[in-house]
């Protein structure tokens, strides 16, 4: 109708102002950055191969291969030998050189690696490389941190097992030089392996003790006794050669023990401790003992 005004258009609720759009975009960007920062956590699951006994699973290796569908994985095929040979550059063994003269053919094939001019008259054996392996004499000798000079050790094997001894030093072969002393527990100067001893927390200060330099591995090496040969008329009279302690051993034993005994006597109850023999009784567990 004439004179009437058209109703004003209502603002669209779905449309947003530019300021609100900018805030919305910022919020989305923040959410994206937070999502990127947080690593996706996979769902924890137990093994597909339940354990029957410790170290033994329910399914075999071939069964697990099919259960895990490992056959679907794609592996790069290894390069064939022919492809490897193609890539390798051939090292030339000979070179062709020009030669002067009309009747010499123009070129000559010459070896790059020339043969020796002289040969040895006798065959000399060559020493083969051992590829980093060293002989036993050059092996690194390591010592347990608990074993230091003056430590009381408990011997676990041999004729003196269970006895307590004093550690003196480590020899070049890696064996330990120990002594009883002889007057306390009848253990002489002898070698023993660090595998077969228990290091106790009891220690003696032997920094002032002078150990003879000739007490080496060669000194303690056992000499082979000669076997008696049967001769006519002496079949029953022959006797086996017996091992006898040399005078040098006796002198060295006294020299070392005379220096260690005063230091043992200075500590109360240490003499009785060295005389006693280590043994386990009922209810005593070695892994729970503090030595």
Swiss-Prot record:
Keywords for the protein's UniProt record, in alphabetical order: Acetylation, Cytoplasm, Endoplasmic reticulum, Isopeptide bond, Phosphoprotein, Ribonucleoprotein, Ribosomal protein, Ubl conjugation
GO terms of biological process kind: cytoplasmic translation; ribosomal large subunit assembly
GO cellular component terms, semicolon-separated: cytosolic large ribosomal subunit; rough endoplasmic reticulum
InterPro entries: 60S_ribosomal_eL6 (IPR000915), Rib_uL2_dom2 (IPR014722), Ribosomal_eL6_CS (IPR049633), Ribosomal_eL6_KOW (IPR041997), Ribosomal_uL6_N (IPR005568), Translation_prot_SH3-like_sf (IPR008991)
Residue span of region Disordered: 1-51
Positions of modified residues (Phosphoserine): 130
Biased composition (Basic and acidic residues): 12-26
UniProt keyword Transcription, yes or no: no
Xref: Pfam families: Ribosomal_L6e, Ribosomal_L6e_N
Biased composition (Low complexity): 1-11
Domain of life: Eukaryota
Described purpose of this protein according to its UniProt entry: Component of the large ribosomal subunit. The ribosome is a large ribonucleoprotein complex responsible for the synthesis of proteins in the cell.
Record's subunit section: Component of the large ribosomal subunit. May bind IPO9 with low affinity.
Protein name: Large ribosomal subunit protein eL6
Organism: Oryctolagus cuniculus (Rabbit)
Organism lineage: Eukaryota, Metazoa, Chordata, Craniata, Vertebrata
């Amino acid at each position: 109708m004439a004179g009437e005004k058209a109703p004003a258009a209502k603002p669209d609720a779905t449309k947003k102002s530019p300021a609100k759009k900018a805030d919305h975009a910022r919020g989305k960007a923040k959410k994206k950055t937070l999502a990127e920062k947080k690593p996706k956590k996979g769902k924890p699951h137990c093994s597909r191969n339940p354990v029957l006994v410790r170290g033994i699973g329910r399914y075999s290796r071939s069964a697990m291969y099919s259960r895990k569908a490992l056959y679907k994985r794609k592996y790069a095929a290894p390069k064939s030998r022919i492809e490897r040979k193609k890539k390798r550059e051939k090292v030339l063994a000979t070179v062709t050189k020009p030669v002067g003269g009309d009747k010499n053919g123009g070129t000559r094939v010459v070896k790059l690696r020339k043969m020796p001019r002289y040969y040895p008259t006798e065959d000399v054996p060559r020493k083969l490389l051992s590829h980093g392996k060293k002989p036993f004499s050059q092996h690194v000798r390591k010592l347990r941190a608990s074993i230091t000079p003056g430590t009381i050790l408990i011997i676990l094997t041999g004729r003196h097992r269970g006895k307590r001894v004093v550690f003196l030093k480590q020899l070049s072969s890696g064996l330990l030089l120990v002594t009883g002393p002889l007057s306390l527990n009848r253990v002489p100067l002898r070698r023993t392996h660090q595998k077969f001893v228990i290091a106790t927390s009891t220690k003696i200060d032997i920094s002032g003790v002078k150990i003879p330099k000739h007490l080496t591995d060669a000194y303690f090496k056992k000499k082979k006794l000669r076997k008696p040969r049967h001769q006519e008329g002496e079949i029953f009279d022959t006797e086996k050669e017996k091992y006898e302690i040399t005078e040098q051993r006796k002198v060295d034993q006294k020299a070392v023990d005379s220096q260690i005994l005063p230091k043992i006597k200075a500590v109360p109850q240490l003499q009785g401790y060295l005389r006693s023999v280590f043994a386990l009784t009922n209810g005593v567990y070695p892994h729970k003992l503090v030595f």
